[in-house]
Amino acid sequence: MAEERKLYMCMRCGRVFSKPEMEILPGIRCPYCNFKIIMKVRSPTVKRIPAV
């Protein structure tokens, strides 16, 4: 299985970064502006399911 890279976005500065970048600082914070509120970015692919 290929390694999936999860991306996060800061709610203050709007920058997108990965988990290894986020682990530079202690705790869960934006590595650029040190803001605590972070959102996980959704994947750009659409998941299609058959209709019932």
From Swiss-Prot:
Compartments where found: Cytoplasm
Cofactor: Zn(2+)
Keyword Nucleotidyltransferase attached: yes
Positions with a binding annotation for Zn(2+): 13, 30, 33
Predominant location category: cytoplasm
GO molecular function, one term: DNA-directed RNA polymerase activity
Free-text remark on how the cofactor is bound: Binds 1 zinc ion.
Keyword Metal-binding included in the entry's annotation: yes
EC number: 2.7.7.6
GO biological process: DNA-templated transcription
Keywords for the protein's UniProt record, in alphabetical order: Cytoplasm, DNA-directed RNA polymerase, Metal-binding, Nucleotidyltransferase, Transcription, Transferase, Zinc
Catalytic activity of the protein: RNA(n) + a ribonucleoside 5'-triphosphate = RNA(n+1) + diphosphate
Coiled-coil regions listed: none
One CC-aspect GO term: DNA-directed RNA polymerase complex
Superkingdom field: Archaea
Family (UniProt): Belongs to the archaeal Rpo12/eukaryotic RPC10 RNA polymerase subunit family.
Quaternary structure annotation from Swiss-Prot or TrEMBL: Part of the RNA polymerase complex.
Described purpose of this protein according to its UniProt entry: DNA-dependent RNA polymerase (RNAP) catalyzes the transcription of DNA into RNA using the four ribonucleoside triphosphates as substrates.
Protein name per its UniProtKB record: DNA-directed RNA polymerase subunit Rpo12
Organism: Pyrobaculum neutrophilum (strain DSM 2338 / JCM 9278 / NBRC 100436 / V24Sta) (Thermoproteus neutrophilus)
